[in-house]
Amino acid sequence: MGNQSTKSTHGTTRVSHSKSAHHNSSRVTSDVIPRSASAISSHERFFSDSQSSSPPAVCPVSAPGKYRNFPGKDVPPICLTDEYNNSDDEVFCSTRTSKQSPLATGCPRQNLGSPGNRRSVDSTNSDLLEAVTPRSHISVKRTVSSGTEHAPDHANMQKSSSLKFTRPGVRSETKETTPSTSSNPTMFPCIHQFLHLTQPQILFVRKTWNHARNQGALEPAISIFRNSFFKNPEIRQMIMFGTKNEGHERLKKHAQLFTVLMDDLIANLDSPSATVAGLREAGEKHVWPTRNQYGCPFHAHLLDQFATAMIERTLEWGEKKDRTETTQRGWTKIVLFVTEQLKEGFQDEQKRARRIKAQIKTSAGSSSFEISTKTKQSDMKRFHTLDNM
């Protein structure tokens, strides 16, 4: 009897020891594992478990009523008591390895070989994690059960200037735009923003221009206009419109204005503060109150033919030793720049004139409507006078 009581006592002791170990393992799961363990991927955990000599002693916590399938046996889940379920230190941590099967659900076991099945298992595991673990303890950095992390697309992310976080999917689209005076007409861009001439080009351009001016004060400009007459007869018709004296006076006036513009431009080629205001204003003057004021309307494409005539004349300026490729490139840049600025001024003035005409039409229509309403009211008042009763 003494031996039997001893055996029973030892047996009882073993049972109680196993129960305490079982209870301690559950406490280890909830107390020993730190908060950052939920952010550790399953691959890293498996690598650390494979490096250690002993197998993992902690059994994962599963959902109530769910069993996990181990090779050769079924182990019931470890359910936390109400004390741990209601505690603030509850942390969900999965200690599954690659040798263990996924969490068993109500649906039949799926084959994990295909990517579609793996995604379905991952979705069920993530749903189970949200059901068991409080939302405040779920790590922000989530990984799928395969352990792979999807790096954010840094190429398609743009940091907001007013906010501290980044907005994914917003691509920064920066476009290099040339300065425009449509938004603010009083601000004109500088010349150096458009013309990028080298010092040798500036030197040869000034030298050839002075040589052409020595032949006559207005000779370079007059030769350019006469050459443009052969490019397009409309240019000749507009400048020489009217009597012979009127045409020559108009040609002389154009040559004087063009010479002044070219003198200012060539003198300020290397000036950082020189603007294109003079060229824009010259282009604006080609918008006339009457469309056919000088025989035919002025079009912007006529300036292209004027540029061709000017380039042909620049090749003849200067001494023969100065007519180099450097000089020709410098003059070509200047001619194209001048015609482009004249076009800009002409087109801006056209838009402004159209807006003014539209406003005049609307104001005229509203005034006529007011006049008609006033006449109707006066007729009604006269109808109720004593004379008509």
UniProtKB/Swiss-Prot annotation:
Domain (Globin) spans 196-347
Q: Which residues bind heme b?
A: 254, 286
Induction data: By anoxia.
Cystine links in this protein are none
Q: Which GO terms describe its biological process?
A: oxygen transport; response to hypoxia
Distribution of this protein across tissues and organs: Expressed in the head and tail neurons and nerve cord.
Ranges of Basic and acidic residues compositional bias?
376-389
Protein family membership: Belongs to the globin family.
Q: What else is known?
A: Does not bind carbon monoxide (CO), nitric oxide (NO) or CN(-).
What is the name attached to this protein's record? Globin-like protein 6
